[in-house]
Amino acid sequence: MKSLPILLLLCVAVCSAYPLDGAARGEDTSMNLVQKYLENYYDLKKDVKQFVRRKDSGPVVKKIREMQKFLGLEVTGKLDSDTLEVMRKPRCGVPDVGHFRTFPGIPKWRKTHLTYRIVNYTPDLPKDAVDSAVEKALKVWEEVTPLTFSRLYEGEADIMISFAVREHGDFYPFDGPGNVLAHAYAPGPGINGDAHFDDDEQWTKDTTGTNLFLVAAHEIGHSLGLFHSANTEALMYPLYHSLTDLTRFRLSQDDINGIQSLYGPPPDSPETPLVPTEPVPPEPGTPANCDPALSFDAVSTLRGEILIFKDRHFWRKSLRKLEPELHLISSFWPSLPSGVDAAYEVTSKDLVFIFKGNQFWAIRGNEVRAGYPRGIHTLGFPPTVRKIDAAISDKEKNKTYFFVEDKYWRFDEKRNSMEPGFPKQIAEDFPGIDSKIDAVFEEFGFFYFFTGSSQLEFDPNAKKVTHTLKSNSWLNC
């Protein structure tokens, strides 16, 4: 057991939150906060008890200056209000270092295929929302490395993910709501690589409370071997960032540099769609990303990327690149038509289905499958249905929803047949979605319905619209 403290010092990453209560704190309380902060994160020796207020040479002043420089504050060495405010913000508890860094000793996984297991669930969210947040967090890192992940439902996985309160068996007890958020361990056997989340926090899938996806993505960075970054835009920056719009999330180049220093870039794979080296240059008729009146024909995912179709073009949005790329549909799939009506991905089949008029095509990567196009009526639609407005596949339930005017049908992907009892009214089961739907797709556990230049973020579990956004927010507008 004598080696355990050293092991934990090297491997544990504890996320701590210091809530701002808005009340004035006494000087002694502030000094105690600063003392502990500098001890925990900037290696201030614990026997340094007196703060030097007038000399720039004091050890505490030096550490304050170091902290201010690292976190992007004005470097004064003084305990101004900005410095104290930052010290109280949610953050990870591992010491701060410059730029991206790995843990001491540079621990990393010696294999590229890793397993994970969700041991238990928080009552704050439906199980499928937790599953989706974790899957998306893993995908953040999978997109930019050779790493792949698969889920185990029993036994020991490389990354064990669990929710717990207070003492939970790893010598780092949680402390109730508002302080420690989560902690994760660097790569290695046993507890190493695992991520624990404080179940006294209010976990959410949106921008209220503590967003599970954002915290999980950060913690998994630690599970893969990353330390902290001084880059304020980085996911691995020590302070917790709550986004007002999750559609704008992207991995910073600093994070990419860090993880690729451990594992390298993603390999070229025959399973990955072939990409033209350059997006199409602007020309007459090319849609402008940030046109306030921009609407979309169809939206789908494809192996972790987002495809947004408009006329004869489509945007490709990937975590690997900061900006979405615009391409001609014909440059990927020469036999597909322009101006498609609907698109959706069935991840279990590794297929994307594209609809136009009374026909549909199946694509896998950059290949249109043989035997297509087929008529939409082979799916079980009545002759009165001439086209599909929008479609989305719920991967947790293995059901696909087809939207046609003010009604919708549901298709069972396992049985490969339309379910009885449909169509139903969209407004009854999707309250708040009362306009004609141009496109729809799923991300972050939400359904995003596009109508003209607007989109509605819909929570399928709560059955309500949670946000109204511009359609082109996915294009960084």
Swiss-Prot record:
Record flagged with keyword RNA-binding: no
Database matches in SMART domains: HX, ZnMc
GO biological process: cellular response to amino acid stimulus; cellular response to lipopolysaccharide; cellular response to nitric oxide; cellular response to reactive oxygen species; cellular response to UV-A; collagen catabolic process; extracellular matrix disassembly; extracellular matrix organization
UniProt xrefs under InterPro entries: Hemopexin-like_dom, Hemopexin-like_dom_sf, Hemopexin-like_repeat, Hemopexin_CS, M10A_MMP, MetalloPept_cat_dom_sf, Pept_M10_metallopeptidase, Pept_M10A
Main location: secreted
The record's free-text note on cofactor binding: Binds 4 Ca(2+) ions per subunit. Binds 2 Zn(2+) ions per subunit.
Name of the protein in its database record: Stromelysin-1
Organism: Homo sapiens
Encoding gene (name): MMP3
